């Protein structure tokens, strides 16, 4: 994949010598930097939110925000190095691989994903890296594939990375335990397009990033503040006003997540603010049910949502990734889930080898909810 034209346009935008750009796919599936008129001073990059919970929004990132993000990332990772690109460039995590490379003065290596993400292609790309200090960004699904019966050469290249940033979706405790047992330097990240990507590493805010928990109307919400926060959404004044605010010269972004801060300032993400399911008058947390399902033998990932139900108002439904999606395997899972969750056990379940995913590695919530709703209604 030739990314030189994209790097050139991105460098011009970051230096204020060219227009802001959005990286999109061209007709051949390759990356293309398209100039965007934002009306925002010092705008450098426009990235789309993933759209996992609704319509994707075009987020405007400034030169200063991206510079602050790169500097704080380098401080957290104790240096700059060469990056391997294994994520789509139209989303913030992919763009940031290029941005960090440009600030570091190193050449990123692009993984060949013409046949999708495979351990073989990742290993081949990682073997091409030349810098002693190496980084990559992955989503949990990718790391799971790399660690499922890994070849010795795959483990060897994974261990060579000074840090593997893991974000886009929560990583299961089992996946993190496996990665650490194999000697991988995995760093869990939390953030979004609105914060130039990950701005909290292993629960700790990056330098210059502030985290607090909302009160009043924003009770329990995670609020992220500091120099990495976006200028706003393109052509969406109402959405920008709801998501961003200024206070004491600090710009803040209101996330859709609930969290808590420990006494020493470590952030724990508790789940989405909209994840409460009211079924038959009983309140249930989708993230709690998801975590219980993921503790069951044979379950590698789970997604839980409420779907419309004539009988219950909402019914608990789950899409689960299982190691054995045969009828016999699913029968065993059914008895285990009822034993673990009782009345909160999902009434409607779809099981497959993997969850439905968006191109950026986040769960495709809308697609899974649609399928679960149809199944629950007998369609």
Predicted regions and their residues:
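Gly/Ser/Thr-rich phosphate-binding loop
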Residues: 148-202
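Conserved pre-ATP/AMP-binding loop-to-beta segment of ANL
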Residues: 31-48, 80-82
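Conserved ATP/PPi-binding loop(s) of AMP-dependent carboxylate-activating enzymes
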Residues: 205, 216-244, 284
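AMP-binding/adenylate-forming
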Residues: 19, 61-69, 82-145, 187
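Conserved AMP-binding A3 loop
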Residues: 42-71, 78
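Conserved ANL (AMP-binding/adenylate-forming) active-site segment centered on the GW(Y/F)…HTG consensus within
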Residues: 229-256, 273-274, 290
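AMP-binding/adenylate-forming catalytic core of the ANL superfamily
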Residues: 226, 251, 258-343
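Conserved C-terminal "lid"/linker of ANL adenylate-forming enzymes
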Residues: 277, 304-305, 317-321, 335-379
